[in-house]
From Swiss-Prot:
Source organism: Homo sapiens
GO biological-process terms attached to the record: hyaluronan metabolic process
Residues bearing glycans: N91, N580
Gene: ITIH3
Gene3D superfamilies: von Willebrand factor, type A domain
UniProt GO cellular component terms: extracellular exosome; extracellular region; platelet dense granule lumen
Domain of life: Eukaryota
Name the record gives this protein: Inter-alpha-trypsin inhibitor heavy chain H3
PTM statement from Swiss-Prot or TrEMBL: Heavy chains are linked to bikunin via chondroitin 4-sulfate esterified to the alpha-carboxyl of the C-terminal aspartate after propeptide cleavage.
Family the entry assigns: Belongs to the ITIH family.
Compartments where located: Secreted
UniProt lineage: Eukaryota, Metazoa, Chordata, Craniata, Vertebrata
Signal peptide limits: 1-20
Keyword ATP-binding found: no
GO MF annotation list: endopeptidase inhibitor activity; serine-type endopeptidase inhibitor activity
Cysteines joined through disulfide linkages: none
């Protein structure tokens, strides 16, 4: 029975030991001073290399160890590697005296009999088993003749998950003896560009940090190298044992100029999604805590310490309650309460007073917490735009009340009804972790084991930090209909800050011209739609550097993700559904050479006219390219209405187009940089638009030579408590004083009652209901241009719902007005005639000219002919232009 609880991945090398009868003892690689440098027990491990290539978060790792038997008799050599639990082994090869024995992945049941036969014959074997919190240990032993060399090579792959804002790759370094050539080489390629890269080790010294470890990144490429010399490996200047014993961790993140990134290679696509700058969605948390007798002592104290830290991180918009279970169930409050300073102080007192007692009634504890969240929603005790979660901590199995795991699972599933996630934390090893994991998975959460160490409280706090900041709920990833096959999971209950959603799939037609991905979700203040478009021809150009990366990495990433998700679904499936999931996961595991819980790695080594094999199983917890350039086409659904059309663009040129006259008027405003002008104000609808002037890089005080533009715009609706500040770098939306920040490179739609805001690269469209639509255009110039800088254009394409009281430099023209142009005559410039304009009881001299309408094309624009009114529009605008200067943007 003990074996059944031992989660192990087995690799057995089925080869007999030397006929000389040399005793089979495990190889320990412990050095002695009397032996030659780098030799232990007659074996010299002269090379250990870890080579990793990471392409778009997908890591391909090769661990190679080379050894020679310096003794005059046969010796046994062991190869130990610790690899992440989330990784899949893809190959293992053994080379003895130049002859290579390759690995082959087979269905586990096919290989099982061969393995059992080998064990019964007493042949050498190795294990891969759980090793610590994040790793599994792979071990294989082989008998090596005197003077012979052996090479072990293990390959594994994994998708690096984003965790608290960065990707992490763990490598265990433990050579156990001095190694002549020891090195770790990691090459990272990210088409989005690398924003940070770091590497550190638990055993690092100043000497190693200064010369043995190098790390660098530039653009899309990053590199980490660790090559300690023999002397640098010594634990002391005269020692022969190695100080290289611990964790080697690489962390990095990528540039996120837009929330999503789509990559397509050979008919497969991957979509990475991680928006930034969004406000946190308020959360309602039911903490369901086990206080049974087994939690007594250090475990309960650590739980209290963690909960006290978590209370420090609660936001005032959050709601919470504590549900304690032992033989019975008790609660801190009858209902969820808001995390006000007063309530949090009372909660701290309650947490400190928790005492252990009695049995373990998991069923009733969970159902009480779930019921509390459901009632809070039904009785409108919590904000409408908030999200609920259940966090349960237990250290044992249910032993009172309903104790059947399958029945508890059913009760919890029915009570939650798919409305919110359940996160289960298993404290220690004396519990049914599979039960906790399965229950969490089928309720859109996950399970974590909390290890009984001195840092258990930090483990608990670390988990909470992962789910503390939901930015979106109800996330749906949508792709072209009938254009994709074999899509991985594309709906998620939450997107948490610092994480990333990854979706992959296969294209029906590889010859598509473009590919579009939409992501919809509910934010803290409004609903959002993010759009990512990829031009396939541009994508093809972007892959010209693909020799830098390994193989069809997107196809393998898709296979990895698909297998991982099929295996998760399989845990809670039954009957025919489970058989189908198993068959699909097995087929993919065999096709892509992954060692999963359904397959085994077999290494064939002919010996004594027999096929000798090595078998590896996968345990569970309980047992170079250029950036993608999406198409920048403007949302053409916004066409100019037949109504008058108004805009300001350029230096700054105000243009009033009057369709009835088949003509247009225009004027400039010359003011100093920093001046804020009132463009639109409507007291009835509550709409206001202001613009701040920015100057060119020369900073000339002479208005005749100075170029000025609008560098910042403020759009506000007082009735909706809505504000949006638009600059050339970003767009910040305040909805009821809660900010959301977007980049101009985002493709996103924000919707709520009476409001729609769409950002599509160089354009932003804001609509207030049916009848008010503004467009903001971003003009970008070469960053190193000696004079010009980026600026904004503002266009009113629909204003028929604005009131008759609307005013401002543009707003005053929203109501019908008449003008007459006469006496057209040659001007000072032969190409620009003058004329007489009669408007608003003024007779003005105007000049024929032309401006550009950039609403559809920010680069080229469309020519617009207009009559230019001189002197800051004097006579055309009401009053003088200085009447429209306001103190600030809002």
């Amino acid at each position: 029975m003990a074996f059944a609880w031992w989660p192990c991945l087995i690799l057995a090398l089925l080869s007999s030991l030397a006929a000389s009868g040399f005793p089979r003892s495990p190889f320990r690689l412990l050095g002695k001073r009397s032996l030659p440098e780098g030799v232990a027990n007659g074996i010299e491990v002269y090379s250990t290399k870890i080579n990793s290539k990471v392409t778009s978060r997908f890591a391909h790792n090769v661990v190679t160890m080379r050894a020679v038997n310096r003794a005059d008799t046969a010796k046994e050599v062991s190869f130990d590697v610790e690899l992440p639990k989330t990784a899949f082994i893809t190959n293992f090869t053994l080379t003895i005296d130049g002859v290579t024995y390759p690995g082959n992945v087979k269905e586990k049941e096919v290989a099982k009999k061969q393995y059992e036969k080998a064990v019964s014959q007493g042949k050498t074997a190795g294990l891969v088993k759980a090793s610590g919190r994040k790793l599994e240990k792979f071990t294989v032993s082989v008998n090596v003749a005197a003077g012979s060399k052996v090479t072990f090579e293990l390959t594994y792959e994994e998708l690096l998950k984003r965790h608290k804002g960065k990707y992490e790759m763990y490598l265990k370094v433990q050579p156990k003896q001095l190694v002549k050539h020891f090195e770790i080489e990691v090459d990272i390629f990210e088409p989005q560009g690398i924003s940070m890269l770091d590497a550190e080790a638990s055993f690092i010294t100043n000497d190693l940090l200064g010369s043995a470890l190098t790390k660098s990144f530039s653009g899309k490429k990053g590199h980490v190298s660790f090559k300690p010399s023999l002397d640098q490996q010594r634990s002391c200047p005269t020692c022969t044992d190695s100080l290289l014993n611990g964790d080697f961790t690489i962390t990095y993140d990528v540039n996120r100029e837009s929330p999503g990134n789509v990559q397509i290679v050979n008919g497969y696509f991957v979509h990475f999604f991680a928006p930034q700058g969004l406000p946190v969605v308020p959360k309602n948390v039911a903490f369901v805590i086990d206080i049974s007798g087994s939690m007594a002592g250090r475990k309960l104290e650590q739980t209290k310490e963690a909960l006290l830290r978590i209370l420090e991180d609660m936001q005032e918009e959050d709601y919470l309650n504590f549900i304690l279970f032992s033989g019975d169930v008790s609660t801190w409050k009858e209902h969820l309460v808001q995390a006000t300073p007063e309530n949090l102080q009372e909660a701290r007192t309650f947490v400190k007073s928790m005492e252990d007692k009695g049995m373990t009634n998991i069923n009733d504890g969970l159902l009480r917490g779930i019921s509390m969240l459901n009632k809070a929603r039904e009785e409108h005790r919590i904000p409408e735009r908030s999200t609920s979660i259940v966090i349960m901590l237990t250290d044992g199995d249910a032993n009172v009340g309903e104790s059947r795991p399958e029945k508890i699972q059913e009760n919890v599933r029915n009570a939650i009804g798919g409305k919110f996630p359940l996160y289960n934390l298993g404290f220690g090893n004396n519990l049914n972790y599979n039960f906790l994991e399965n229950m969490a998975l089928e309720n859109h959460g996950f399970a974590r084991r909390i290890y009984e160490d001195s840092d258990a409280d930090l483990q608990l706090q670390g988990f909470y930090e992962e789910v503390a900041n939901p930015l979106l709920t109800g996330v749906e990833m949508e792709y072209p209909e009938n254009a994709i096959l074999d899509l991985t999971q594309n709906t998620y209950q939450h997107f948490y800050d610092g994480s990333e959603i990854v979706v992959a799939g296969r294209l029906v037609d590889e010859d598509m011209n473009s590919f579009k991905a939409d992501v919809k979700g509910h934010g803290a203040t409004n609903d959002l739609t993010f759009t990512e478009e990829v031009d396939m021809k541009e994508m093809e150009k972007a892959l010209q550097e693909r020799d830098y990366i390994f193989g069809n990495y997107i196809e393998r990433l898709w296979a990895y993700l698909t297998i991982e998700q099929l295996l998760e679904k399989r845990k809670n499936a039954h009957g025919e559904e489970k058989e189908n999931l198993t068959a699909r996961a097995l087929d993919l595991s065999l096709k892509y050479h992954f060692v999963t819980p359904l397959t085994s790695m077999v290494v064939t080594k002919p010996e004594d006219n027999e096929d000798e094999r090595a078998i590896a199983d996968k345990p569970g917890e309980d047992a170079e390219a250029t950036p993608v350039s999406p198409a920048m086409s403007y949302l053409t659904s916004y066409q100019p209405p037949q109504n008058p059309y108004y805009y300001v663009d350029g230096d700054p040129h105000f243009i009033i187009q009057i369709p009835e006259k088949d003509d247009a008027l225009c004027f400039n405003i010359d003011e100093a940089p920093g001046t804020v002008l009132r463009l639109i104000q409507d007291a009835v609808t509550g709409l206001t638009v202001n613009g701040q002037i920015t100057g060119d890089k020369r900073g000339s005080p002479d208005s005749k030579t100075r170029k000025t533009y609008f560098g910042k715009l403020g759009i506000a609706n007082a009735q909706m408590d809505f504000q949006v500040e638009v600059t050339t770098e970003k767009i910040t939306l305040w909805n009821r004083a809660v900010p959301s920040t977007f980049s101009w490179l985002d493709t996103v739609t924000v919707t709520q009652d009476g409001l729609s805001m769409m950002i599509n690269r160089k354009n932003m469209v804001v609509s207030f209901g049916d009848g008010v639509t503004f467009v903001v255009v971003l003009h970008q110039v070469w960053k190193k241009h000696p004079v010009h800088r980026d600026f904004l254009g503002f266009y009113v394409v629909d204003s028929h719902r604005m009131s008759a009281q609307t005013h401002g430099l543009l707003g005053q023209f929203f109501q019908p007005f008449d003008f007459k142009v006469s006496d057209i005559r040659p001007g000072s410039d032969p190409t620009k005639p003058d004329a007489t304009l009669v408007v608003k009881n003024h007779q003005l001299i105007v000049t024929r000219g032309s401006q550009k309408d950039y609403r559809k094309d920010a680069s080229i624009g469309t020519k617009v002919v207009c009559w230019f009114v001189h002197n800051n529009g004097e006579g055309l605008i009401d009053g003088v232009h200085t009447d429209y200067i306001v103190p600030n943007l809002f």
